[in-house]
C-alpha cells in the first residue's frame, strides 16, 4: 500500500518498489497547470511512457513577462530537468512560451521539441456561420505569430479575438477544487454573448482553457464548438516517439517538478496523483 510522504522540497508516495519497464521520457512543461490538459491527451494515446510534468509556479503567469525573460527561463528549466533525466522529447504545453521560446530550445537541445499553437486552422474548417472566436491570453491574442496564423488559415472567416488572463486564474482554481462562478464567466464572455451572430466555433488558445470546457459550454450559445490543440499535439508526439532512433530509456516513476513548494501546490498533490504522478518535487535551478 502506498502512503504519502511530505518533506521540505518533496511530496511523494512511498510504496513497495515495482519493476517498471524501460521507456522513453517525455517532459511536458507549462507555466501553470493548464498543460495537464495536453499531458492528458498525450497519455491517453501513449499510456506506457515515462512522464515528467514541470510547471513554473514561481514566475506564473507568463503572459505579462518579457520575451527575453520567457526564453531564458524556459531554456533554464528544460536544462535543469535534462541534467537529472535523459529526455527523449519535450512538449512546451504553453501557448505563450511556445510562440516565443521554440527556436531557442531547438537550437540548444538535440531532442525534438513540440509546441502548441492556437487551433485556428481546424476551427476555420469547422465553422458553419463563418464566425470564429479566439479565446486566449491577452499576450497570445497580441502576438504577431497569432496574426500570421489567422492570415494563413482563416482569411475567409471573421475572427473575434478575446484575451483574458482571468480565465487562466479560474482554471487554476478549478483544478484545486474551487467552484467556478458562471456569472464571472458570463462577464468575461459578454463581448461575444451580446452579439446578434456570436462565434459558432471557439478556439481555446490557452492550454488552461480546456479545463473549463464544461463551464464554457454552459455559458456559450448551445451548439458552440470548442476546439483546442491537445489531440493534434498528442498525435504529433506519438509520431515523433515512434520515429526516434534509439531514444534514451528510463525505469523511473512519473513525477512533477515545480519551482517552489507552497501550501497551494500541496493542495494539488491529490489531483496530480489522479493524473498518474508519484511524486512532486522542487526543481533546483
From Swiss-Prot:
The active site is at residues 94, 206. It is an enzyme of class 5 (isomerase). Substrate binds at residues 30-31, 62-63, 95-96, 207-208. Its EC number is 5.1.1.3. Keywords: Cell shape, Cell wall biogenesis/degradation, Isomerase, Peptidoglycan synthesis. It comes from the Bacteria. Pathway: Cell wall biogenesis; peptidoglycan biosynthesis. One of its GO terms (biological process) is peptidoglycan biosynthetic process. InterPro entries: Asp/Glu/hydantoin_racemase, Asp/Glu_race, Asp/Glu_racemase_AS_1, Asp/Glu_racemase_AS_2, Glu_race. Coiled coil: none annotated. The keyword Cell wall biogenesis/degradation applies. One of its GO terms (molecular function) is glutamate racemase activity. PROSITE patterns: ASP_GLU_RACEMASE_1 (PS00923), ASP_GLU_RACEMASE_2 (PS00924). The keyword Oxidoreductase does not apply. It catalyses: L-glutamate = D-glutamate. SUPFAM superfamilies: Aspartate/glutamate racemase. Belongs to the aspartate/glutamate racemases family. Provides the (R)-glutamate required for cell wall biosynthesis. HAMAP family: Glu_racemase. NCBIfam families: glut_race, PRK00865.1-1. This is Glutamate racemase.
Amino acid at each position: 500500500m502506498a502512503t504519502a510522504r511530505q518533506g521540505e522540497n518533496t511530496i511523494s508516495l512511498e510504496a513497495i518498489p515495482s519493476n517498471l519497464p524501460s521507456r522513453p521520457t517525455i517532459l511536458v512543461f507549462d507555466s501553470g497547470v493548464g498543460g495537464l490538459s495536453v499531458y492528458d491527451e498525450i497519455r491517453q494515446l501513449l499510456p506506457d511512457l515515462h512522464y515528467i510534468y514541470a510547471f513554473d509556479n514561481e514566475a506564473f503567469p507568463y503572459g505579462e513577462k518579457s520575451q527575453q525573460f520567457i526564453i531564458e527561463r524556459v531554456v533554464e528549466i528544460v536544462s535543469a530537468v535534462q541534467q537529472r533525466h535523459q529526455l527523449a522529447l519535450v512538449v512546451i504545453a504553453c501557448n505563450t512560451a511556445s510562440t516565443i521560446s521554440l527556436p531557442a530550445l531547438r537550437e540548444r537541445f538535440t531532442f525534438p521539441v513540440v509546441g502548441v499553437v492556437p487551433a485556428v486552422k481546424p476551427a476555420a474548417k469547422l465553422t458553419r456561420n463563418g464566425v470564429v472566436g479566439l479565446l486566449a491570453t491577452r499576450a497570445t491574442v497580441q502576438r504577431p505569430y497569432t496574426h500570421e496564423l489567422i492570415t494563413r488559415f482563416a482569411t475567409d472567416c471573421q475572427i473575434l479575438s478575446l484575451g483574458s488572463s482571468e480565465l487562466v486564474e479560474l482554471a487554476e482554481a478549478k483544478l484545486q477544487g474551487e467552484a467556478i462562478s458562471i456569472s464571472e464567466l458570463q462577464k468575461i464572455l459578454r463581448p461575444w454573448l451580446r452579439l446578434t451572430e456570436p462565434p459558432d466555433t471557439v478556439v481555446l488558445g490557452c492550454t488552461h482553457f480546456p479545463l473549463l470546457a464544461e463551464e464554457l459550454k454552459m455559458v456559450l450559445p448551445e451548439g458552440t464548438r470548442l476546439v483546442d490543440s491537445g489531440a493534434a499535439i498528442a498525435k504529433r508526439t506519438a509520431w515523433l516517439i515512434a520515429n526516434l532512433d534509439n531514444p534514451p530509456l528510463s525505469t523511473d516513476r512519473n513525477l512533477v517538478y515545480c519551482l517552489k513548494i507552497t501550501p497551494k501546490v500541496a493542495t494539488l498533490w491529490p489531483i496530480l496523483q489522479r493524473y498518474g504522478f508519484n511524486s512532486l518535487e522542487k526543481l533546483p535551478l
